[in-house]
Regions:
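Conserved core of the PLP fold type I
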Residues: 69-215
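N-terminal small-domain helix-loop-helix segment of the aminotransferase-like
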Residues: 11-108
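Short, exposed beta-strand "edge-strand" segments with a Pro/Gly-rich flavor and a Y/T-containing core
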Residues: 3, 51-53, 188-194
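Generic N-terminal amphipathic, Lys/Arg-enriched alpha-helix
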Residues: 1-11
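Conserved small/polar residues in nucleotide/adenosyl-binding loops
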Residues: 223-225
Length: 225
């Protein structure tokens, strides 16, 4: 009998490691007390009493808007011009960078990552991710009929720049372009944030590798944490 779903779909259950680690942290808190455990496992901001932070400046402003304004379509499927301008200003902050850029509104960070994979990689090409990663990266690649190749994220307590370079060079030689995910800062699920020196090494390498083909790195979704 024919299967209803695609033949090449990944039938493995999705396991999001961050929630496994969250459960371990919660178990440790229950056993040892919250004063003895720092839970830095998930991308949420909590106050000193352990309560989820919901900023009044955000929600009060949103709630003050007329419901018709909130329900109205944007002027373009890529987002209102003022929204796109503010997103770019938020990304570059006060660096005064004048980058060639285009901003597109997506349904959340997941939509941004998924859209990038679909628009950058052809079917059968490879997405590069860290060996410890958010489980949905692989799912997004599978949906796009793409493969996944992982670099070892850590060398001891530091970012494994050697493994990252080796993996990127291998993929570049095979397909002529690189789409790599570095989830930083506050990497999901480890919470690791790369140092300025580590980022300088990555940037220098990517500038060098870009002589062989396009190089794209993404996912700063937790930069606000």
């Amino acid at each position: 009998m024919k299967k209803f779903i695609r033949e090449n779909i990944d039938h493995q259950p999705i396991v999001d490691n961050v929630f496994k680690i969250v459960n371990l942290a919660n178990d440790a808190i229950a056993k040892k007390g919250k004063e003895n455990i720092v839970n830095a496992t998930i991308g949420s901001l909590y106050d000193e009493d352990g309560n989820l932070v919901a900023l009044d400046t955000v929600f009060n402003t949103y709630n003050s808007l007329d419901n018709r304004t909130k329900a109205k379509y944007a002027s373009s499927f890529s987002g209102n011009p003022n929204f796109r301008k503010q997103v770019y200003n938020w990304v570059v902050q006060d660096t005064k960078l004048d980058l060639c850029h285009s901003v597109i509104g997506t349904p959340g960070g997941s939509g941004a990552v998924s859209s990038t994979i679909l628009n950058v990689l052809d079917e059968g090409q490879t997405l590069i991710i860290p060996h410890i990663a958010w489980g949905n990266y692989k799912s997004m690649a599978t949906i796009a009929n793409c493969k996944v190749q992982a670099y070892q994220m850590f060398d001891g307590d530091a970012f494994n720049i050697t493994s990252f370079k080796e993996t990127c060079r291998e993929v570049m030689a095979r397909q002529g372009k690189v789409l790599a995910i570095i989830n930083d800062p506050c990497h999901n699920p480890t919470g690791y944030s790369m140092t300025v020196e580590e980022w300088n090494q990555v940037i220098d390498f990517c500038n060098e590798l870009s002589n062989e083909g396009p190089v794209i790195i993404l996912d700063l979704s937790l930069i606000h944490i």
